[in-house]
């Protein structure tokens, strides 16, 4: 096999790999916008999802409160949806929005 044939083969394999990887990670994005996340994290939580397709119903995979989670998109909440969030622990003081590992400040009012 000549060097030009080998080069064509390698480029072809690279293109096929890129197209296949894009198809796997792509998928159909669900409607709505992810909520704003103003929390600074000391450590990221393990992801609960990787794409919108990992989430049930209308929920989207969004980075929120230190990790990727399935959440109801902002547009859906404005239309009367339910946050359906578990809130444990007090909300941080205004101006300090850091989340330490193991704590949860979801559902706290935004400024």
From Swiss-Prot:
Gene3D superfamilies: Elafin-like. Residues 101-111 have a biased composition (Polar residues). Disulfide bonds join 34-62, 41-66, 49-61, 55-70. SUPFAM superfamilies: Elafin-like (SSF57256). Pfam families: WAP (PF00095). Antibacterial protein. Putative acid-stable proteinase inhibitor. This is WAP four-disulfide core domain protein 12. The gene is WFDC12.
């Amino acid at each position: 096999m000549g060097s030009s044939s080998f080069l064509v083969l390698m480029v072809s394999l690279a293109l096929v790999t890129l197209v296949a990887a894009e198809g796997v990670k792509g998928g159909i994005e669900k409607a709505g916008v992810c909520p704003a996340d103003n929390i600074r994290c000391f450590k990221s939580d393990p992801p609960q999802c990787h794409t919108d397709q990992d989430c049930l119903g209308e929920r989207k995979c969004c980075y929120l409160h230190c990790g990727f989670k399935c959440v109801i998109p902002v547009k859906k909440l404005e239309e009367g949806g339910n946050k359906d969030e578990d809130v444990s622990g007090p909300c941080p003081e205004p101006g300090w929005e850091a989340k330490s590992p193991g704590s949860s400040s979801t559902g706290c009012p935004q400024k």
